[in-house]
Amino acid sequence: MKAIIPPENLTELLERANMMAGVSLAQIAANRGITVPKNLKRDKGWVGQLIEMELGATAGSKPEQDFLHLGVELKTIPINVQGKPLETTYVCVAPLSQIEGLTWENSLVCHKLQRVLWVPVEGERQISVGARRIGTPILWQPDPDELRLLQQDWEEIMELIALGKVEKLTARHGEVLQLRPKAANSRALTQSIAENGSLKMTNPRGFYLKTAFTAMILNKAFG
């Protein structure tokens, strides 16, 4: 299977993304010789990976933007018939130790959300995976209010992590950004700060954007 060359510039990236609008996942997969899974229970990242491949994203699972040379992160977002997001959006793994001196400005969350290409995809369960169509893409940059909310949530969450209170953080914390266990396997462990300042083992956590926030982004774009 021939790899897609990364887009040279923003215009080319947007052209590629717009060309996918209205196309089904089965059509994209067939063009690439990829088998469509019956469901996404075991292939949760399949849709995102397919679209990354079609657009020529380069980051893979590396901690950087998908189109680093363009300063753009790619995010697929499953939506219902009303165009509302069906689930929270994963941003990146949260650092749980060695966080001294880490600020919002040099955080991975800030880096990833500088500029995002949102690609909505039909996500209703009654639509088979292959029949789900891709929507119109949105190139988004957080405005000052959105940035303030993101920074505020990130700083509050990181402060609790630094105080060794990671276990007390629930998905309800944060207005727009939340912290949740990341690993599919609950036996996966990573180091985190304990309340007495030592290190302890806990499940890895990830930062996620809440659906109310992503719904706001879609509403602003589509009205």
From Swiss-Prot:
SUPFAM superfamilies according to UniProt: Restriction endonuclease-like
Gene Ontology terms describing biological process: DNA modification; mismatch repair
A GO cellular-component term linked to this record: cytoplasm
One Pfam family linked to the record: MutH
Compartments reported by the entry: Cytoplasm
Gene3D superfamilies named in the record: DNA mismatch repair MutH/Restriction endonuclease, type II
Family annotation (SMART domains): MutH
Keywords: Cytoplasm, DNA damage, DNA repair, Endonuclease, Hydrolase, Nuclease
Name the UniProt record assigns to this protein: DNA mismatch repair protein MutH
Species of the source: Shewanella sp. (strain W3-18-1)
